[in-house]
Design a protein with these regions (language model features):
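C-terminal boundary and immediately downstream tail of ABC-type ATPase nucleotide-binding domains
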Residues: 12, 230-253, 277, 296
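Helix-to-loop junction immediately C-terminal to a conserved catalytic motif
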Residues: 52
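Conserved ABC transporter NBD signature motif
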Residues: 60-72
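ABC ATPase nucleotide-binding domains
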Residues: 84-86, 94, 99-234
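Glycine/charge-rich catalytic "coupling/switch" loops of P-loop NTPases
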Residues: 259-306, 328-358
Length: 358
């Protein structure tokens, strides 16, 4: 359950690291799960470390539940151990010399709970995670999925106002990730505090998060729910993330001029600066110019071929770069190889056009 009022987290993160500057505003409501996505070096982990108190703000503030945790201009800074925050790191960082039970009990103990009560709380959390029978095991005796659940239990055992998850599923194999993602979704649904999930995996974000924030070069480039972002990507990175070809151009009626030279026919009238998007599955390939050519037809050269699920993803160079998805049977029939010349077509009805502004 989410709310749009009284946000649990209200932060403006300005962090200078050499020539890189993170300048990011975050608001996360109680019960809301927000995913922070972006390419490597975008500033995602820096943001998480700053919220946790592991990196210093240059300017801005971190306010949680109405209380300032970090505000340089007022010389306010709350140490990491005193922040009501739970963190699950990418490699979990379980204490190797402690049992699963004592790893989870560490959080309550750090907050002043006596040893017996802390272990009782920890046992309850392990039971909720389905790990009651693993309480005495050391981290080296746990599978990746089990270690992830112990780390999550340790973070949740302190009843955090803010839960920070740094690539929590990245270290798992495909099968374990599938099962653990479903379990994580259930536990996040029960968490009443705010949750910020840092991930590079769009599936993790789409399954686990209520809202997505896309960061590139230290700044927010797009924000919204999954449906909005997947329907209207605004950068090349976001387009790749959601699996679309994306172009920016000038619209004049039913034509969009891309790059000042390449016209794309569309099915709806637009005017001014627009984005044009279409899925790789909308691109058809031919060995020669097809008869009765669709309005969008152009020569291209294959620059790469790779497997993409049950299909092949073909990268094309030409007037515009484009990705096309075709079946292995179609690729064999066309004898496709890198460097080969082909013709690409896209129906106007397959394109999606929307304004650059708004």
């Amino acid at each position: 359950m989410t709310t749009d009022t009284d946000p649990s987290l209200d932060a403006h993160l300005v962090v200078d690291q050499g020539t890189f500057r993170l300048d990011l505003t975050l608001r996360v409501a109680p019960g809301e799960v927000v995913a922070l996505l972006g390419p490597n070096g975008a500033g995602k982990t820096t943001a998480l470390r700053t919220l946790a108190g592991l990196a210093a703000l240059t300017a801005g503030h971190v306010t949680l539940g109405g209380t300032d945790l970090d505000r340089p201009e007022r010389r306010v800074w709350v140490p990491t151990e005193r922040r009501p925050i739970g963190v699950v790191f990418q490699d979990y960082l379980l204490f190797p010399h402690l049992s699963a039970l004592d790893n989870v009990a560490f959080g309550p103990r750090r907050h002043g709970v006596d040893r017996r009560a802390a272990r009782e709380q920890a046992a309850g959390w392990l039971d909720r995670m389905g790990l009651a029978d693993h309480a005495r095991r050391k981290p080296r005796q746990l599978s990746g999925g089990q270690a992830q659940r112990v780390a999550l239990a340790r973070a949740l055992a302190v009843d955090p106002a803010l839960l920070l998850l740094d690539e929590p599923l990245a270290a798992l194999d495909a099968r374990t990730r599938l099962d653990t993602r479903a379990e994580l979704q259930r536990h996040l649904g029960d968490h009443t505090g705010a949750t910020l999930l840092v991930t590079h995996d769009p599936l993790d974000a789409l399954v686990l998060a209520d809202r997505l924030i896309i960061v590139e070069d230290g700044r927010v480039v797009q924000e919204g729910d999954a449906a909005t972002i997947t329907a209207r990507p605004r950068t090349d990175y976001v387009a790749r993330l959601v699996g679309l070809n994306l172009y920016r151009g000038a619209a004049n009626g039913l034509t969009v001029l891309v790059g000042g030279t390449f016209p794309l026919a569309t099915a709806e009238q637009h005017h001014g600066d627009v984005f044009v998007a279409f899925p790789p599955s909308a691109v058809a390939l031919y060995p020669k110019r097809p008869d009765g050519s669709p309005r969008n037809t152009w020569p291209a050269t294959i620059s790469g071929i790779q497997r993409h699920g049950d299909n092949l993803r073909v990268q094309l160079d030409g007037p515009v770069g484009v990705a096309a998805d075709i079946t292995p049977l179609a690729a064999a029939h066309l004898h496709l190889v890198p460097g080969q010349a082909v013709w690409a077509t896209v129906k106007a009805t397959e394109t999606r056009v929307y304004p650059c502004s708004g």
